Amino acid sequence: MNIFSGIEYKVLKDVNLDRKYDGIEYDSRKIKENYIFVAFEGANVDGHNYIDSAVKNGATCIIVSKKVEMKHNVSYILIDDIRHKLGYIASNFYEWPQRKLKIIGVTGTNGKTSSTYMIEKLMGDIPITRIGTIEYKIGDKVFEAVNTTPESLDLIKIFDKTLKKKIEYVIMEVSSHSLEIGRVEVLDFDYALFTNLTQDHLDYHLTMENYFQAKRKLFLKLKDINNSVINVDDEYGKRLYDEFIVDNPEIISYGIENGDLEGDYSDDGYIDVKYKNQIEKVKFSLLGDFNLYNTLGAIGIALKIGISMEEILKRVSNIKAAPGRFEALDCGQDYKVIVDYAHTPDALVNVIVAARNIKNGSRIITIFGCGGDRDRTKRPIMAKVAEDLSDVVILTSDNPRTESPEQIFDDVKKGFIKSDDYFFEPDREKAIKLAINMAEKNDIILITGKGHETYHIIGTKKWHFDDKEIARREIVRRKMVENVN
């Protein structure tokens, strides 16, 4: 098959271009003998600067998105808008593995990761590939995630490996960014779940309308829009549902307040699940409406796949939180420490409200920060949320990246109404220690922002930093001091 089939390209230099190639990469460090190197301009790195390195490593064909000096004895191909075309080249090279798979796409501001984990759980023994923020999993093999939705070339490689392992289903998080820049352009989805849409990524999308339109693209990529599952308690979900339901009557709507599929907390440790006028009481160990919403969405997808409600509800009882999602750390202390990925205003509301509902809880001590080089408009909103809903607030650092930490903190502080009624500790490790040392019996410490992440980004460098690791260490240290005294 011609790997350039279906796309416009211009041959700048032909050196045995029709040869059979052994691989394709956009990272020059991964290039081997007789590989194709794809050079494109990323947000921080321009691949055209690494052509020499790629050729040195064995590249025999260079795909460029702008004219360059052709000083090597290799083929050069010019392709405009290569980020959108890379998926076609990769698909041609790997013979379109995605067409032989059933792909479940999950999109929304919050809940994508938890939903993919829950869908996997509800599918029981069906082997799956799962792609998302925390990790990429192919059968029983787990790989570190680079992006929520990988580059199109990496996606196609994952699909190729999935097929070779005889796995049929792929569950993947689909970010708005990936929908906008073409990472999923060559995919047609079999099922799609919409969790919610709240403020985030406005540094990229600029407006909520643009953000919504990006998410909406997933549903236009469905083979059959009837295989949608949509949260209609969310205003944008309701809008999506209202648009599509007229011509697609089999869409499943869900929610706590409205929907074909409804759920609510009932007795302690149980939820009621209502579907087609049947109500079932199910044991449920997770706290917070956000976990209930994610579970309902996962149930909807499982139903669409063809799993019986009876089988689904048996598995609901065994659902556990994804790593770093409202994850409790138990080191024998008499106060609670919970780590959560919440880094948007809505997610912060959800975790604090969930903490409030914990039985015998006392004060809520919330640690939060805001990432650098990201949506600045959400920063004061998060401060207001933390102040309004918490008893104690500790403002700290959370991946400042290349932005001035002082600028980030200044933006955040504008949201505090009581100007001095919070703790400010820019050193995140010290902030965690401060919270643990001030905690009293039955207090609940919420360490938000990083969740599963094990790094802190300062400038362009990642430093090892694990909220859970530090919190456990400080809990144990405090207990040792108390035992001595």
Curated annotation (Swiss-Prot):
> Does the record carry Cell division as a key word?
yes
Write out the annotated subcellular location.
Cytoplasm
* Alphabetically ordered keywords of this record: ATP-binding, Cell cycle, Cell division, Cell shape, Cell wall biogenesis/degradation, Cytoplasm, Ligase, Magnesium, Nucleotide-binding, Peptidoglycan synthesis
Q: SUPFAM superfamilies attached here?
A: MurD-like peptide ligases, catalytic domain, MurD-like peptide ligases, peptide-binding domain, MurE/MurF N-terminal domain
Q: Where is the signal peptide?
A: none
GO molecular function annotation: ATP binding; magnesium ion binding; UDP-N-acetylmuramoylalanyl-D-glutamate-2,6-diaminopimelate ligase activity
Positions bound to meso-2,6-diaminopimelate = R374, D398, N399, P400, R401, G449, E453
Residues found modified as N6-carboxylysine = K215
Decide whether keyword Protease is in the record.
no
- Maturation and modification: Carboxylation is probably crucial for Mg(2+) binding and, consequently, for the gamma-phosphate positioning of ATP.
Q: Which cofactor does it need?
A: Mg(2+)
Identify which top EC class this enzyme belongs to. ligase
The domain of life for this entry's organism is: Bacteria
The residues that the entry says bind UDP-N-acetyl-alpha-D-muramoyl-L-alanyl-D-glutamate are S28, N147, T148, T149, S175, R183
> According to its record, what are the GO cellular component terms?
cytoplasm
Q: Which residues bind ATP?
A: G108, T109, N110, G111, K112, T113, S114
| UniProt xrefs under InterPro entries | Mur-like_cat_sf, Mur_ligase_C, Mur_ligase_C_dom_sf, Mur_ligase_cen, Mur_ligase_N, MurE/MurF_N, UDP-N-AcMur-Glu-dNH2Pim_ligase
Q: Where is this motif: Meso-diaminopimelate recognition motif?
A: 398-401
Under catalytic activity, the entry for this protein gives: UDP-N-acetyl-alpha-D-muramoyl-L-alanyl-D-glutamate + meso-2,6-diaminopimelate + ATP = UDP-N-acetyl-alpha-D-muramoyl-L-alanyl-gamma-D-glutamyl-meso-2,6-diaminopimelate + ADP + phosphate + H(+)
Database matches in HAMAP family: MurE (MF_00208)
Give the UniProt family note.
Answer: Belongs to the MurCDEF family. MurE subfamily.
For this entry, the protein name equals UDP-N-acetylmuramoyl-L-alanyl-D-glutamate--2,6-diaminopimelate ligase
